[in-house]
Amino acid sequence: MSKSFTFKQFHIDIGSCGMPVSTDGVLLGAWADIRACSQILDIGAGTGLLSLMSAQRNSDAHIDAIELMPIAADVARLNFYQSPWKERLTLIHHDFLTYQAPHKYDAIICNPPYFNNGEQSQKGERSTARHTDSLPFDKLLQHCKTLISPTGRASFILPVFEGELFIKVAKNDDFHLTKITKVKTTEKKSPTRLLIELSLFPHIYQESTLTIHDGNGYSDDFIKLTRTFYLNMD
């Protein structure tokens, strides 16, 4: 496993936390609507990827990144310090479910855990990062509800089955599904991921599909979405 990943404007050191840079994370970081946001919360920050992408995309925002795992928190803190935006990035080593913020957030971003109990395939921090028991969907959404502003947007990425379940739980907690993008690896395959936007305010609903690969490599839509981050994507 590579211990680092370099983007156009920042660098991710993975260290010993066992959380590699994933396509899921890059998709969410590029897709989430953080325009006109001044306060952004990154839940389960891991190496800090989503926070760094948000800082690059929105030069006016302050990003709070909350991470429970000590090793990951140290790695994210280092990545923030080495970035061009360290003054706007704050690492909070804390359990999200007991976190009390001094203000509401305009945007929340989260790549939630999705392994159900008994399905863990690995040990350690990477397994914890993907295990639903560490941050159950209902508790995650209930606490998001207390932290998000009345018109704020919360963005997530999940596999299709878990994403559909997540949306049902969200609606029970008074969230509106305001945007969804179904992600396919190729045109002929079924979607494998859902990019999900929720809000307590009923924004206009948007639905789309994103295909990552076409016959010649990466699709035009994928390149357009991620070209400001990936090297050699122009």
Curated annotation (Swiss-Prot):
Name of the featured protein: tRNA1(Val) (adenine(37)-N6)-methyltransferase
Keyword Methyltransferase: yes
Localization annotation: Cytoplasm
An example Gene Ontology molecular-function term: nucleic acid binding
A single GO cellular-component term on record: cytoplasm
Protein's organism: Aliivibrio fischeri (strain ATCC 700601 / ES114) (Vibrio fischeri)
Listed EC numbers: 2.1.1.223
Predominant location: cytoplasm
Catalyzed reactions per annotation: adenosine(37) in tRNA1(Val) + S-adenosyl-L-methionine = N(6)-methyladenosine(37) in tRNA1(Val) + S-adenosyl-L-homocysteine + H(+)
UniProt superkingdom: Bacteria
Keyword Protein transport on entry: no
Function noted in UniProt: Specifically methylates the adenine in position 37 of tRNA(1)(Val) (anticodon cmo5UAC).
Keywords: Cytoplasm, Methyltransferase, S-adenosyl-L-methionine, Transferase, tRNA processing
InterPro entries documented for this protein: DNA_methylase_N6_adenine_CS (IPR002052), SAM-dependent_MTases_sf (IPR029063), Small_mtfrase_dom (IPR007848), tRNA_Adenine-N(6)_MTase (IPR050210), tRNA_adenine-N6_MeTrfase (IPR022882)
Residues annotated as signal peptide: none
Family: Belongs to the methyltransferase superfamily. tRNA (adenine-N(6)-)-methyltransferase family.
